[in-house]
Amino acid sequence: MDNQFIFQYSWEILPKKWVHKMKRSEHGNRFYTNTDYLFPLLCFLKWHTYTRVQVLIDICGVDYPSRKRRFEVVYNLLSTRYNSRIRVQTSADEVTRISSVVSLFPSAGWWEREVWDMFGVSFINHPDLRRILTDYGFEGHPLRKDFPLSGYVEVRYDDPEKRVVSEPIEMTQEFRYFDFASPWEQRSDG
């Protein structure tokens, strides 16, 4: 059974409201879904006879500030039985919460915590949603495109006081404008 069969079969059997777009490539299949249907879609992919996705490779976050639903959450899956890779993608905004898939894939706990910590995308029913890579007192989410490069505070070791201190960063520049347009997508003069 190959990727083409899995793609065709999934397209025919899945409810159309679960998947609003699918793409097939030699490296695997891509399913685009709404956050409301993410959990049922992943249940189908894990338990159905012709998909049998048993491995959650990772969960990634991507920030597209120009989009209305600016965050894209990508689930990279592997079916060892059929030697097939499947990528499930969904989009969310700052307030949309995504269903946690820890009950399906226990390893998702770490990945969901990372996506929440770095991007601020929240997961419903996550057993332990707290920061994993940044400090507990950290403000903001550092992989968002609108997060300042310098951060908000400076953390350093103060030798005379013999302790770590946090101080607000003093910037002479009050406002910075970020141009999110890609230079490759602009019109050419030729």
UniProtKB/Swiss-Prot annotation:
Going by the record, the broad EC class of this enzyme is translocase
What is the residue range of the signal peptide feature? none
Q: Which reaction does it catalyse?
A: a ubiquinone + NADH + 5 H(+)(in) = a ubiquinol + NAD(+) + 4 H(+)(out)
Localization, UniProt? Mitochondrion inner membrane
- InterPro entries linked to this entry: NADH_DH_suC, NADH_quin_OxRdtase_su_C/D-like, NADH_UbQ_OxRdtase_30kDa_su, NADH_UbQ_OxRdtase_CS
Q: Of which family is this protein a member?
A: Belongs to the complex I 30 kDa subunit family.
Q: Name one GO cellular component term.
A: respiratory chain complex I
Is Transmembrane one of the keywords UniProt gives this record? no
- Chief localization: mitochondrion
What is the name listed in the Swiss-Prot or TrEMBL entry for this protein? NADH dehydrogenase [ubiquinone] iron-sulfur protein 3
Enumerate the UniProt keywords alphabetically: Electron transport, Membrane, Mitochondrion, Mitochondrion inner membrane, NAD, Oxidoreductase, Respiratory chain, Translocase, Transport, Ubiquinone
